[in-house]
Amino acid sequence: MKESILDVLLYLFEHYFSEDADLVRDHDSLQNGLIQAGFSPAEISKAFDWLDALSEQRPSVARPHVDGPVRIYHGPELDKLDVDCRGFLLFLEQHRILDADQRELVLDRAMALDQDELDLDDLKWVVLMVLFNQPGAEAAYAWMETQMFLDEPEPVH
């Protein structure tokens, strides 16, 4: 049986959300499909809670990118996100793929996963899911998706 929240989220994203974002509202049919795919009801419930928290934290108005102070990570964040993950978040912010609010949302959603540590690939999926859920972030989402699925990622312009 597949047992992590991230596994459930990735399955949902790859099989459902990439085709129709409105499917997230139909928890019953999604849950049945996930159970048939081998996920436990407990992990499915946690994944739905994760998605609900993501949609509740959606910013109401897109803010322009402003250069602000560097984010200082604290204990649990340092434990969960290695230097590659933290460097990647800084890279995304410096290249205006994420703004400060989106970075904080990515951090919140990464910390909400039931894993002791996240590797860079896991964090990239969290970033992709957050951007997918952000109004006005279509270009950033498209760039991030390209980074994940192409053998040779395109550079940031």
Swiss-Prot record:
InterPro entries per the UniProt record, alphabetical: Smg (IPR007456)
Highest taxon in the source lineage: Bacteria
Family note: Belongs to the Smg family.
Official protein name in the record: Protein Smg homolog
Taxonomy of the source species: Bacteria, Pseudomonadati, Pseudomonadota, Gammaproteobacteria, Lysobacterales
